[in-house]
From Swiss-Prot:
SUPFAM superfamilies per record: Zn2/Cys6 DNA-binding domain (SSF57701)
GO terms, biological process: DNA-templated transcription; positive regulation of transcription by RNA polymerase II
GO MF annotations, alphabetized: DNA-binding transcription factor activity, RNA polymerase II-specific; RNA polymerase II cis-regulatory region sequence-specific DNA binding; sequence-specific DNA binding; zinc ion binding
Annotated segments matching region Disordered: 646-668, 769-792
Organism: Schizosaccharomyces pombe (strain 972 / ATCC 24843)
Pfam families in the cross-refs: Fungal_trans, Zn_clus
Protein name: Uncharacterized transcriptional regulatory protein C530.08
Length: 815
């Protein structure tokens, strides 16, 4: 050891005295000209390159390259950090040095939490998709020369993408209406008396003095006519969201006609008259006398309602009725205004908190019903506008309304109460959709990207909600139209929210799109399937809308205008999907949706939407015809290659629909309308899909049978009262329609009785948590296992497909 240390010392002394040639220092900087031309700079000023070119050398000068942050911004951050460090030194004993143990521990904890979240995710949940929808854009109102904002959930954003691809001089107009679509080649007669009634009227103004309106000078109808109009209006307004009842109105109306105008009941009474006469106007739209009465009562009601200081429960009811009146006139901007005033009064009265002290049971129930009614309207209008929520779910602890025990409320049928109860639950989930998927500050979602984990969590919430529904809202009740009316409405809103989840990924239907090519090959099938889920949800919306429009036409109950807005949004979604896929099968569903809106169009604003839909459909047909003509002109030697998935198993088409591989060899060419008859793009088996029909390359590795199987499924299905093509749930129609063995759908009688007895419970503001076992999507047992199947557990699609494939093999062997 001593000899080794001695030799090392001698070598070090020799090296110290030696003259070792120094290496040339590597220049880490360069002047701007050398950096721009990507040539070597000698590190002098001027450098040889600039000297030869007789240019000004910028070496050792501030760089002219743009920095991501301005110097002022960096200095501002440094000053803020110094200020925070000063506060910490004065008030705490923390060591703020960069190598202090506490600071290093903090960094390690933060890094560990971030990496732990990623590591605990399954590989498929780590997938990040590109969104085609931003969080919102500014649009120009050409009529008034102003700009306005619409968020990502608004139909404005999707229409903006649509008109870029669809020829025909379409434009975004009417920003304050629910139908923001126009066409330069379609002109309407604005002098029509019926249309002039629907032009925006003056709304509440702070400059208008309330004292300038004398209630005694307002002409009112006779007391008998007023009672009749009020009863009809209250039954119309509170048919679904029963925040007010007719039981207390006759006494208050007689007191009002006796000369007692004190309190806030008078503006509420005027708003009820406005809605009642509007109900009669829809049966006779050209009645100018009714139009003048409606304008007069809405005008006075908007100015007499007290929403600033002396407001009460009746003020909130009045504002909510005025909001519904504007909502029915498609003036969603004015509806938003009055709804926000009512929500502000709700918060100031504490209706969002579960306060029971000092109130009777009837008053407590009334407070709950009023708050949850305005809560649902807030979520609906926030979805239409893409605006932030009016009240956060974290600030609410109000209970849901229980089964009423009061004579004034028990007259409302049980199905309406059930619809209201479960509708509130559904709108709670819509809050999660808007905050997790369309909020700029949500986790796992950036300005242009969406995490697959967020989509899966939202899917679990919606599946858990569906599994908790009673049977009356999961299947049509024969001979009970009113119950089916609520069933169709709830299904329509449910699938519109599912469509809202997948809409940002709709561009993945185009397999050659840059977004699809940017994904890894294993993730492309997932993206394509999610885009197909959006089309699937839109088709189910159309089917529910078709049944709902027929029923509404028979009963003249056509005021749930959300159905019309959902129908318009569905048509835009299907047209955009048809543009991407070039599939004429979607034209059938677009036509059905158009007919449903025509059946609901009882006022001129909605009727004016029909020529625009026809114009869009005409432009779409021209594109599909040109695509089909180009496909037919292909040389026979260059016939399109057919992509066949590894498992040609019929999906949700029943065991009787087996796939014959020999028949798949004959490729059917797409066809369009000929001699008034519309034919499908692919009339052959769903297993034969040409690449060129979807603009696909062979190396895309995407099973495009998914889209064709989905369309075939909706064509072959017996009824629409079933889980849709991509959603696997435990439902009774599954056993009837898909012929699933009983061991897969065995129901625990104890669990079933508990579920039936808990249709309406007094629960706090609790949401279906995906971590709870009832809301989770669990894998079902194998086919050979006879364990009873929990009705709240989702059915595994793989087991169903395996069962179908086994039946297909048995049928082929028997044949």
């Amino acid at each position: 050891m001593d000899n080794e240390s001695h030799s090392q010392e001698t070598e070090s002394k020799i090296l110290e005295g030696a003259k070792v040639a120094t290496r040339r220092r590597r220049v880490t900087r360069a002047c701007d000209m050398c950096r721009r031309k990507k040539i070597k700079c000698d590190g002098l000023r001027p450098c040889k390159n600039c000297k030869a070119g007789k240019l000004e050398c910028t070496y050792h000068m501030p760089s002219s390259r743009k920095s991501s942050f301005s110097p002022e911004y960096v200095e501002n951050l440094e000053s803020r950090v110094r200020y925070l460090e000063t506060l910490l030194k004065k008030n705490t004993n923390f060591d703020l040095s960069s190598n202090s143990p506490s600071f290093l521990f903090f960094l390690r904890e933060q890094k560990f939490q971030a990496t732990n979240e990623l590591e605990n995710m399954s590989p498929e949940r780590k997938v990040i998709f590109t969104s085609m929808i931003n969080y919102g854009n500014l649009f120009v109102d050409a009529k008034h020369g102003t700009r306005y904002f619409r968020g990502g959930s608004s139909i404005h954003v999707l229409i903006q993408h649509l008109i870029r691809r669809l020829p025909g001089d379409f434009e975004i107009c009417e920003p304050y209406s629910a139908y923001p679509l126009g066409n330069k080649n379609i002109q309407f007669d604005d002098n029509d008396p019926e249309y002039q009634f629907f032009t925006p009227t003056p709304r509440f103004s702070i400059d208008f003095m309330v004292s300038s309106v004398d209630p005694r000078e307002i002409q009112l109808p006779g007391i008998e006519e007023a009672l009749c109009i009020t009863k009809a209006a209250v039954s119309y307004v509170s048919g679904i969201v029963f925040y007010t009842t007719y039981a207390d109105f006759p006494k208050k109306i007689r007191l009002l006609y006796s000369g007692n105008y004190q309190g806030n009941f008078f503006p509420l009474f005027l708003s009820i008259l406005c809605v009642g006469y509007y109900h009669h106007l829809l049966n006779n739209p050209s009645n100018t006398e009714l139009q003048s009465l409606i304008k007069k009562y809405s005008f006075y009601s908007e100015r007499l309602v007290k929403s600033a200081d002396n407001f009460t429960i009746e003020s909130i009811q009045c504002l909510l009725i005025l909001s519904i009146y504007r909502y029915c006139r498609t003036e969603i901007s004015a509806a938003w205004y009055y709804m926000k005033l009512g929500l502000n009064c709700c918060l100031r009265l504490g209706l969002h908190r579960n306060i029971t002290e000092g109130f009777t049971e009837e008053q407590i129930d009334s407070r709950r019903r009023i708050f949850w009614a305005i809560y649902c309207y807030d979520r609906q209008l926030c979805t239409l506008f893409g605006f932030p929520l009016g009240v956060r779910d974290e600030d609410i602890d109000q209970c849901l309304p229980v089964t009423p025990k009061f004579p004034s409320v028990t007259e409302i049928e049980a199905n309406a109460r059930l619809f209201f109860f479960h509708g509130v639950k559904l709108y709670k989930i819509s809050s999660r959709i808007l905050t997790k998927l369309y909020s700029p500050n949500s986790r796992n979602v950036t300005k242009k990207h969406i995490s697959y984990a967020v989509i899966q969590d939202l899917e679990q919430l919606l599946d858990g909600f569906y599994n908790s529904l009673p049977r009356v809202f999961r299947a049509e009740q024969p001979g009970e139209f009113q119950a089916n009316h609520f069933f169709y409405n709830l299904q329509l809103v449910y699938y519109s929210f599912r469509m809202l989840i997948y809409r940002p990924l709709l561009h993945y239907l185009e397999a050659d799109s840059p977004a699809m090519q940017a994904l890894k090959v294993p993730d492309r099938q997932t993206a394509f399937t999610l885009a197909c889920k959006c089309v699937d949800s839109a088709i189910v919306c159309v089917q529910n809308l078709s049944h709902l429009s027929k029923g509404l036409k028979r009963t003249l109950d056509r005021y749930y205008w959300t159905t019309v807005y959902c129908g318009f949004s569905t048509i835009v979604t299907l047209i955009f999907a048809a543009l991407l896929t070039k599939n004429t099968n979607l034209l059938i569903h677009i036509s059905v949706a158009r007919e449903s809106i025509e059946a609901l169009a009882h006022e001129c604003v909605t009727r004016r939407l029909l020529p625009l839909i026809d114009k869009m459909r005409e432009s779409l047909m021209k594109i599909l015809e040109s695509n089909a003509d180009g496909y037919k002109q292909m040389s026979p030697t260059k016939a399109p290659q057919v992509f066949e998935s590894e498992s040609n198993v019929p999906i949700n088409n029943g065991p009787q629909q087996s796939i014959d591989k020999e028949s798949n060899s004959n490729t059917q060419l797409p066809q369009v309308e000929t001699e008034g008859q519309q034919q499908s793009v692919f009339d052959g088996n769903i297993g034969t899909i040409p690449y060129q029909a979807y603009n696909m390359n062979e190396d895309s590795f995407i099973d495009i049978n998914t889209l064709s199987s989905m369309l075939n499924y909706h064509t072959q299905a017996v009824s629409i009262h079933h889980p849709s093509f991509y959603i696997s749930r435990s439902d009774v129609p599954l056993e009837e329609e898909f012929q699933i063995p009983n061991e897969l759908l065995a129901v625990d009688p104890v669990a079933e009785s508990m579920q039936e007895n808990s249709d309406i419970i007094n629960e706090a503001f609790g949401l279906v948590d995906p971590d709870v076992s009832d809301g989770k999507s669990r894998e079902s047992s194998s086919l050979n296992n006879s364990t009873p199947f929990n009705p709240t557990v989702n059915i595994d699609p793989a087991s169903i497909l395996e069962h179908f494939s086994q039946n297909v093999m048995k049928d082929s062997q028997n044949s």
